[in-house]
């Protein structure tokens, strides 16, 4: 409960104004006369936001921004008084993104998430329709627009084969960034593509931990598919997955899709889910129960984050598998 948070209590006692993030950011943009480039989507928004920040920095264009992951080329947030644009990872959780009317909106992908906020897929889609309608220029994949009952006015002419980034989802979202930035910079499409082909990535988004070991924050069906597609694209041998679900509530939502997500992997280890904001009335889906749900004919095993799992991972890596 935010009302009982000690920092809020202290601020109120000291007469210090406080607000939600979106209210604060709107006030900041208004006072500093900055235009927002908002990146929204069920999946891919962190990486896509970072791509836009990376490109503007490489072009030596002043930029202010806020992104939800650690960057190798800057802090998670930065304010430059000389910047014209504020690049923002616009999260749909708690309908946060509906507080903004961006100059440019980039939609990295629309699926379905956050059933605790959006009880139905229709309510989730309606939020994206509303966000798009209150944005000035929108760059999105036609299939995502069709999914929410909208249509694209123009189709990208940026050739996806020009990108050397790993992962088809990253190449598709790089297209959107190039299209968007080409409208507000003097750079050619060719130069923007070259810059994005050198994009170093962000933490926890198919981040290389060591040789043949990667970490990814994929926790919805499309995010998991995207991560596995990248893994299968770069793996020399087999792909092994250690799966830690995010929220027991979300596991109930994706449980029936688990078997379809695991096609082509050699071994699946399922560890206990990370718990937060849970519906206590729902059955706890333990690793054993999730292993039973995963019907795909893949070798699967319940596990915990211990030395035994570490030993198994080491054996897979030594065998040339990608984990």
Enumerate the language-model features and the residues they cover.
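P-loop/Walker A phosphate-binding loop and immediately adjacent motor/lid segment at beta-alpha junctions
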Residues: 10, 16, 134-139, 228-235, ...
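Structural motif
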Residues: 21, 104, 238-240, 267, ...
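Short internal beta-strands
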Residues: 138-143, 240-244, 264-275
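Phosphate-binding loop of NTP-binding sites
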Residues: 2-139, 146-152, 178, 182, ...
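Active-site regions of enzymes building and remodeling cell-envelope glycoconjugates
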Residues: 15-17, 102-106, 147-166, 213, ...
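Nucleotide phosphate-binding/pyrophosphate-handling subdomain across enzymes
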Residues: 163-267
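C-terminal helical cap/extension that packs against the catalytic core
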Residues: 151, 258-319
């Amino acid at each position: 409960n935010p009302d009982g948070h000690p920092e809020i209590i202290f601020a109120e006692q000291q007469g210090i104004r406080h607000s939600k993030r979106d209210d604060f950011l709107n006030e900041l943009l208004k006072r500093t006369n900055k235009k927002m480039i908002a990146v929204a989507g069920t999946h891919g928004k962190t990486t896509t936001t970072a791509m836009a920040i990376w490109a503007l920095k490489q072009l030596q264009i002043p930029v202010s921004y806020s992104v939800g992951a650690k960057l190798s080329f800057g802090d998670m947030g930065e304010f430059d008084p000389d910047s014209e644009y504020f690049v923002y990872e616009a999260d749909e959780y708690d309908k946060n993104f509906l507080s903004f009317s961006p100059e440019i909106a980039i939609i990295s992908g629309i699926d379905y998430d956050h059933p605790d906020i959006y009880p139905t897929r229709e309510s989730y889609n309606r939020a994206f329709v509303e966000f798009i309608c209150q944005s000035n220029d929108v760059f999105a994949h036609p299939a995502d627009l069709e999914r929410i009952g909208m249509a694209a006015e123009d189709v990208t002419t940026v050739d996806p084969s020009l990108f050397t980034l790993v992962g088809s989802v990253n190449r598709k979202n790089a297209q959107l960034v190039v299209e968007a930035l080409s409208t507000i910079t003097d750079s050619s499409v060719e130069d923007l593509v070259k810059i994005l082909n050198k994009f170093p990535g962000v933490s926890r988004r198919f981040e290389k931990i060591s040789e043949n070991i990667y970490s990814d924050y994929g926790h919805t069906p499309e995010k998991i598919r995207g991560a596995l597609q990248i893994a299968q694209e770069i793996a020399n041998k087999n792909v092994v997955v250690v799966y830690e679900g995010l929220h027991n509530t979300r596991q109930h939502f994706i449980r029936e899709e688990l078997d379809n997500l695991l096609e082509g992997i050699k071994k699946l280890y399922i560890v206990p889910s990370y718990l937060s904001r849970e519906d206590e009335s729902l059955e706890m889906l333990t690793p054993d129960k999730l292993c039973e749900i995963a019907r795909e004919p893949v070798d699967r095993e319940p596990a915990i984050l211990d030395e035994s799992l570490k030993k198994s991972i080491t054996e897979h890596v030594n065998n040339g598998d990608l984990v």
